[in-house]
Regions:
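A short, surface-exposed beta-strand/turn
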Residues: 79-100
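Positively charged n-region of N-terminal signal peptides that target proteins for export
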Residues: 1-5, 9
Length: 210
């Protein structure tokens, strides 16, 4: 009976005593806002010289594992990058290179695609990393940097159109780009075509509605 009472008291103590429960902030912070202010300090020391602007965490939160995540918007949301801070391990991971190179990347794609073609850069993906890739060409050719590109055509697609898609894909690949290209005529879509490959014209023309 005494043992049972002691066991109950120990259980109550674990519940009530501060620090005995799992704390996603590891006792370092009180809330997400405090973490955000701390991470703001870190990212400004690391990256502000590259962006020439004060960097602030937005859309942030902390998961149950104690990993704080946020999006950093740069130049009035012209581009952005993500950060993750592990509160317990005190480690920061970021894809800041994405934001740093994003504007130039879009310009590079725009200069590669003929003016006669309509397109949309649907996404630029970059795995979060501790390192910062300052060299643009190293960033583009990095295996973690991937683009998703959509090319638009009106109505029927000719063989010449399909060959133009092949040329665009080769040009992007020659520049070091990784990722995928897909064609759309407004209703139908081609296969998802991987950069670095030479797709068959028939696979490209699957977006044809005739």
């Amino acid at each position: 009976m005494i043992k049972r009472i002691l066991a109950v008291l120990v259980l109550v103590s674990v519940i009530l005593i501060p620090g005995c429960t799992k704390d996603k902030y590891s006792g370092e912070f009180k809330n997400d806002k405090e973490v955000a202010e701390y991470v703001d300090t870190i990212i400004n020391k690391k990256y502000s010289r590259y962006f020439d602007a004060k960097l602030c965490c937005s859309d942030y939160g902390t998961n149950d594992e104690g990993v704080f995540y946020a999006t950093v918007y740069v130049k009035d949301e012209k581009y952005e990058f993500g950060v993750e801070y592990n509160i317990k391990n005190k480690t920061l991971e970021s894809d800041a290179s994405k934001g740093y190179h994003y504007e130039k990347l879009l310009e590079d794609i725009r200069n590669t695609i003929p003016d006669t073609m309509r397109y949309d850069v649907q996404s630029v993906k970059c795995n979060k990393r501790k390192g910062f890739i300052k060299d643009y060409h190293k960033f583009v050719s990095d295996k973690d940097t991937k683009i998703e590109l959509m090319l638009y055509f009106d109505g029927s697609m000719s063989d010449d159109d399909a060959k133009q898609v092949q040329r665009v894909m080769k040009s992007l690949s020659d520049k070091g780009f990784n990722g995928t290209v897909q064609c759309c005529n407004g209703e139908y879509y081609s296969d998802v075509l991987k950069l670095g490959s030479i797709p068959d014209i028939k696979d490209i023309e699957k977006c044809d509605n005739e």
